């Protein structure tokens, strides 16, 4: 085998090892985004909830800063319960519809029903909770203890 071939083989192996540590993207995030838009009738873009308070977005700790942040904590806890049931909430795809009364779930499996219910509950909670711009992109190391 030529030295160049060995280098290519080594590069491929290293790439595969590195890729195995990259977490999968949350596939149902797009669905959750649409549920949010349906529930709030497009009044606020979904990305506004991605970095809000102590719990809206990746991770979460401390005491929620307000009602909207509590919605995110409840959603995180709901996903935690789904995981205890053996579900993968961030990867679970489900069927939902946006009707005149807002979003609703129409799914088949237990995991799909549970995860869709988590997302639906959060989307409706977001829609009825006041949004405080001061709680967007806060310093979580100081405010979320």
From Swiss-Prot:
Pfam families noted in UniProt: Phospholip_A2_1
Protein name: Basic phospholipase A2 cPt09
Gene3D superfamilies: Phospholipase A2 domain
Subcellular location: Secreted
Signal peptide span: 1-21
Function: PLA2 catalyzes the calcium-dependent hydrolysis of the 2-acyl groups in 3-sn-phosphoglycerides.
Family membership: Belongs to the phospholipase A2 family. Group I subfamily. D49 sub-subfamily.
GO-annotated molecular function: calcium ion binding; calcium-dependent phospholipase A2 activity; phospholipid binding
Keywords of the record: Calcium, Disulfide bond, Hydrolase, Lipid degradation, Lipid metabolism, Metal-binding, Secreted, Signal
Residues holding Ca(2+): 55, 57, 59, 76
Superkingdom per UniProt: Eukaryota
GO biological processes: arachidonate secretion; lipid catabolic process; phospholipid metabolic process
Family annotation (CDD domains): PLA2c
Tissue-wise expression: Expressed by the venom gland.
Catalysed reactions listed for this entry: a 1,2-diacyl-sn-glycero-3-phosphocholine + H2O = a 1-acyl-sn-glycero-3-phosphocholine + a fatty acid + H(+)
Cofactor binding summary note: Binds 1 Ca(2+) ion.
PANTHER family (UniProt xref): PHOSPHOLIPASE A2 (PTHR11716:SF51), PHOSPHOLIPASE A2 FAMILY MEMBER (PTHR11716)
Proregion residues excised on maturation: 22-27
Enzyme class: hydrolase
Coiled coil spans: none
Obligatory cofactor(s): Ca(2+)
The keyword Kinase is annotated on this UniProt entry: no
Keyword Disulfide bond: yes
